[in-house]
Amino acid sequence: MTRDDRVSNLKFGGISCHCPTAIMKLSVVLFVAASCLLAGAQVQATYKDGKGTTHWEQHELDTAISPDERERLVETMVKAHQIVDKERSKQRRYSPKDTYAPVNVPCPPMPEGDNYVGFVRNATNQSLNPNEAAYVKRHRQNNKRRWADWLKRAGMDDNGVPGGVDSFLSDERNQPRVGFAASGGGYRAMLVALGVAQGFDERNKTAMDRGVGGLLQLADYFAGLSGGSWATGSMAINDWPTMQSLVDDVMDLSSNLIKPSDDKFSFYKDLFNDVSDKKDAGYPVSISDYWSRALSYQLLNKTDHSPMFVHHGQRTTYSDIVNTTSFKDASYPLPIVLSIGRPPNEIMINPNATYFEFTPFEFGTWQPYLQAFFPVGYLGSDMRLSLIHISE
């Protein structure tokens, strides 16, 4: 199976030893594509000073949050950060476990195949990851009978399908290829993507009555960028619940992400603690860590309110998706999260910027000057010549 087979899916359904190893946090993956959204919003909302430093326009800041609210929020952040620094200066946790910080794990077995150089997969031949190809093949085999039922419900048995649906699908090459593509746009894009997924869900009676229900389960891929990736990741890591139950029982959308209504101090204290864990483990941190960790409170497993925020979503990794029941059964589309590369300090995204993708199996890009992939579960590992470097 090649990349062309996968791309055709998205075009068809474009709806819109111990080694120092970093376990990729799902919250970080949910963030990586958000730069596109932020960059688009900054076109008319920023200016550069004489030194070339970019600043927000004051009226944009005041629109997002009033000066008084901003001052109180900064005071809360500073207080939480000071307490975290004070506590951590007394007792550092050099080997955090089951936290947001990356951890050391046994070295994985070396991938097998002629197109692997160490742990890096050479994708110049445009072939898919063997695990991805196997998943999609099993998913399509599981859905052969369901495709026949769906096409018959759509009235295509005696109208438009030569020889009838059953005869047409007897050749596996005729089985339709469908993929969903969710655009960026923050929470709006996320909710639209969830609404679209619900509209094609076989568990939705209205969708079944209208003849479109079941297409979600039949699709081979569900890809998302920026806000669309928040929906994609949340659906997949939570084992594809109904969209209504995901919003009602898992997500916490009633609380503001920046100034939560429940307990601002606990929120920021836990946020600073988790990111500090990663820093203490020897890994670089950035604003991406704070933003993605904040997103995880709302989009991953249900928040533990006793105490508020603590441990919520911090242990979840993107590669955990492969352990869900739906993924093991290959009963839902393979999720793909997309992101766009952007150099430091660059505001506008270059039209020729590199697109990267994250699947539950690997991370990388198809663009010609790279065309390489790496196991997503070990992102952050110190690599030397395609091999994991073991620090002395």
Annotate each PLM feature:
Residues 1-23, 389:
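Intrinsically disordered, low-complexity basic segments at termini and long loops, enriched
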